[in-house]
Structure formats: C-alpha cells, structure tokens
Design a protein with these regions (language model features):
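Membrane-interface extramembranous regions
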Residues: 1-139
C-alpha cells in the first residue's frame, strides 16, 4: 500500500508539473484542453494533479498517513471520475477531460479505495494461561 501511495503521489506531481509547463496559465478554463500523452489537459487539471501529488509526497512518509492519502485520493477521485463521464464533451466540462483521463482517474481511485478498505486480519498466536495478577496463581 505504501508503495502504491508513493507511486500515485509522485506520478500526479510530475503529471501536474509537466502539464503546467506545457499549458502555462493561459486559457485557464479551456473546455477543450490540449493533448498530453493520451490525455487532454488544461491548467485546472494540472493544478489539481500537482497539489494532490505534492500533498501525497508529504503524506507518504508514514504508513498511517499514506493510508489516509489513499483514502482521500479514492474518496475524491471516484466522484470526480463519475462526473467526468457525465459531463465529458459538454460545455459544462471546464476541466477539458477526455475518456482516457476519466478512465485513469477511475482506475486510480478504485485501486486506492480497494487498498484502504482491504482488511488484513492479524493472525494471533494461541493464548497461554497466565498467572493471575491478584494472587499470583495460575488460571
């Protein structure tokens, strides 16, 4: 889980930074976006990816914070992806997303939530009778 959290954080930060270098802050809410790899991006999505990645880089130093980071990525990314499917290609999509970017958000969100919600029950060793703390005798 920690490795996936670090991978997501670094990938989002790099994606956001390179995207901002490509788009700058011109046409901040361009509904069409510009092509980047197989995605379309605009400054809105780049800033969101960069901030999410930088927060994640800071949070993935500890396992408990990495788990919270993945919970945030999943809890925020899942509705983000669903809305992306609904408004994709319309003028309401001021993030300029395309289906590939929406699929990416959905996949990362689902894997993040799966890792957070997956319960690994600890295997407890069999208990041995212990001394009674009151009288010092055995149980």
């Amino acid at each position: 889980m920690l490795g996936f959290a670090r991978l997501v954080a670094h990938a989002l930060a790099a994606f956001g930074l390179v995207g901002l270098l490509m788009t700058g802050f011109d046409y901040f809410s361009n509904v069409t976006g510009i092509p980047f790899l197989m995605f379309t991006i605009n400054p809105n999505t780049n800033v969101i990816h960069l901030v999410t990645g930088l927060v994640g880089i800071e949070m993935t130093g500890r396992a408990d914070l990495a788990r919270r980071y993945l919970l945030l990525v999943g809890a925020m990314g899942l509705p983000w992806a669903v809305v992306g499917y609904v408004v994709e290609g319309t003028m309401a999509d001021f993030f300029g997303r395309n289906p590939a970017l929406v699929h990416f958000h959905l996949g990362v969100s689902l894997v993040a939530l799966l890792l957070v919600l997956w319960r690994r029950w600890p295997v407890l060793p069999p208990t041995q009778p212990t001394a009674d703390p009151v009288d010092g005798g055995s149980i």
